[in-house]
Amino acid sequence: MSNQHMLLLFNLLPVGSNISTWWNFGSMLLTCLALQTMTGFFLAIHYTANINLAFSSIVHITRDVPYGWMMQNLHAIGASMFFICIYIHIARGLYYGSFLNKNVWLSGTTLLIILMATAFFGYVLPWGQMSFWAATVITNLLTAVPYIGTELTNWLWGGFSINDPTLTRFFALHFILPFTIISMSSIHIMLLHTEGSSNPLGTNSDIDKIPFHPYHSHKDMLMLTIMMTALFIIMSFMPNIFNDPENFSKANPLVTPQHIKPEWYFLFAYGILRSIPNKLGGTVALVLSVTILMTMPFTHTSHFRSMTFRPLMQFMFWTLVATFITITWAATKPVEPPFTTIGQATAILYFTFFIMNPLLGWLENKISITNM
């Protein structure tokens, strides 16, 4: 589309008329990013990146700073909203074959990895018990890297244990990475607009397009309003619903929490990590749990783009959704039967989806050719 920039200027960007509510999550993610950047800035003004003062500075923000409690809660709950939206956004991409737009999909997966790193660094900053021990467990995984693992870990820590230099660099990274996310998001959107969105049918939208404004812009506003309403209801009535009780105690390296676990949005990866009773194997599986998404454009064998007309693949997709929820739940439980068995079974099921994707595509092609 040669005159696309002129159309964008006049807000007449042509969009497929049949894209559903599942296509609204991109704009919701953009809103989450703006919200996190703003609240994060106001929190950073009052935060102190020192192991003796970090916990107290969070208490100071929530108690003494005007509207500090609101900034802190919005930032914490906003992170959960961000991940809810991004997981739905990815699920939409998997279901409707958006991954066939390779550049958009690969830039999106890179964005997810940067976002997860940013959220992890942010979780360490309050320097509560769970912050400290989650950081200890996750950064320790670097020691599983052959030959250079220990050196890598000490380099990341800035010493021989998690200490003040670790917190300082995690704060610096947590501050700088969102700007990388903003840059990558711009690239992601630019790449999307070179080819345009897919649609529920998985067909070419060129024959039936409508202006983005007012049609899709109003649809986006509805979902944004629902999301912001949900955010403020949670903030007002149950602000600590996503928090871990352990994190209300200051970090103590001498006392280990009974059950170390990260934030809920990392639990699926954490569940896969601990389902393998080997440090290196678990670390590889943890990395693969996210990076395996990058294989999707290269393993698609079906003649159909979308899963709308692929019942076998639909079954696999909804199994993946159930598996994701089950791993998340199992990872909150102690490392004992039956939770270990459930974790191992669901970890196998999770990767089965990506293995079955090319096989089922090939099988469906065979069936459709036979029936013609």
Curated annotation (Swiss-Prot):
Keyword annotations from UniProtKB, A to Z: Electron transport, Heme, Iron, Membrane, Metal-binding, Mitochondrion, Mitochondrion inner membrane, Respiratory chain, Transmembrane, Transmembrane helix, Transport, Ubiquinone
Compartments, record wording: Mitochondrion inner membrane
Gene3D superfamilies to which the protein is assigned, alphabetical: Cytochrome Bc1 Complex, Chain C
Example of a GO MF term: ubiquinol-cytochrome-c reductase activity
Family: Belongs to the cytochrome b family.
Residues given in the record as heme b b566 binding sites: H89, H188
Cofactor binding annotation: Binds 2 heme b groups non-covalently.
TM ranges: 25-45, 69-90, 105-125, 170-190, 218-238, 280-300, 312-332, 339-358
Keyword Transferase on entry: no
Oligomeric and partner information: The cytochrome bc1 complex contains 3 respiratory subunits (MT-CYB, CYC1 and UQCRFS1), 2 core proteins (UQCRC1 and UQCRC2) and probably 6 low-molecular weight proteins.
Binding site for heme b b562: H75, H174
Signal peptide: none
Cofactor: heme b
Membrane topology designation: Multi-pass membrane protein
Gene Ontology process terms (BP): mitochondrial electron transport, ubiquinol to cytochrome c
Domain of life per record: Eukaryota
Predominant location: mitochondrion
Descriptive protein name: Cytochrome b
Residues at which a ubiquinone binds: H193
Known role: Component of the ubiquinol-cytochrome c reductase complex (complex III or cytochrome b-c1 complex) that is part of the mitochondrial respiratory chain. The b-c1 complex mediates electron transfer from ubiquinol to cytochrome c. Contributes to the generation of a proton gradient across the mitochondrial membrane that is then used for ATP synthesis.
